[in-house]
């Protein structure tokens, strides 16, 4: 019985980046031997055990054979005669198919170290095409390791395109697709996930609402990049620069879906695109069972980003109605998220990524002024029932209106 550290831990160690999880592979052992040593079995589909003291995962060496459609269509063989090389052969990328024994000796039968040096994401074997989930995984690794200079090997991209053309991506469950999307959103360069998916032919299959944005023109005066799809990924890139919040990044990704619905005769203008995008966002979120907090922020950003961009021109009445509609009195934490997504939208344009976004601080200040209007004096003044709400609204509008007049005077030369 031999134990090896495998996968991401060995890869990250060779890349000199922090190791998140340590996974171990056991060669030459049976299930009973593992149980006798105090390991606790947790794997349903194949033998995976938790170490009795560290609770780290130990999996018996195994091989997999394609028996059906999708990422779950495999039969697993785990037995003491499965070798280290056979187990590593089933893995997706060479950089993930490196092992290290307990003495620190590295085993690299498929050239993973050379690919780390060349910054290449390359498949281990042609069995790569048997698992459609790997298209998403490679796109995610491309996003994660883009800051280190990694690229997808051309021959691996060809296999990803083959998987997309085969129709197997449709066999992926919504939960697994969102799981990969969510992990991609947490990387430093989430836009790369979608760029790689698009090159592989998977974007049109899994995220047709985003694919539809490519080729849709915008006014060059406001959007030097012109193409809405390019703008969308630039906005996502800026959202990642501005915030670690995955909800903000998701909202940035889908904020302009409505532009794909603009009538051709109106292009490159997109009147009401924020509202047109709302049903598309709802459908996408329902399809992938996106968490409600992601969905709600995305809907808010799509609906209100034009108003936030035009904040200095908004009437105080409109501003308070925006706060009402966004339910910010009960959920004030939503406002910074909304403003960050809008700032990313402003900066996600060619040549404008360093442009200031004073609308953010302005709207936040207006909200704080309105939120500080006290309800107690209104009640003490004798207002009752619906009158209280009306008076509260009136005073909120007045306090913002005073601030608007004051800032307008101060802004004059």
Curated annotation (Swiss-Prot):
Coiled coil: none annotated. Its cofactor is Mg(2+); Ni(2+). Comprises two domains: an N-terminal domain containing the nucleotidyltransferase activity and a C-terminal HD domain associated with both phosphodiesterase and phosphatase activities. PANTHER family: MULTIFUNCTIONAL CCA PROTEIN. Catalyzes the addition and repair of the essential 3'-terminal CCA sequence in tRNAs without using a nucleic acid template. Adds these three nucleotides in the order of C, C, and A to the tRNA nucleotide-73, using CTP and ATP as substrates and producing inorganic pyrophosphate. tRNA 3'-terminal CCA addition is required both for tRNA processing and repair. Also involved in tRNA surveillance by mediating tandem CCA addition to generate a CCACCA at the 3' terminus of unstable tRNAs. While stable tRNAs receive only 3'-terminal CCA, unstable tRNAs are marked with CCACCA and rapidly degraded. Belongs to the tRNA nucleotidyltransferase/poly(A) polymerase family. Bacterial CCA-adding enzyme type 1 subfamily. This is Multifunctional CCA protein.
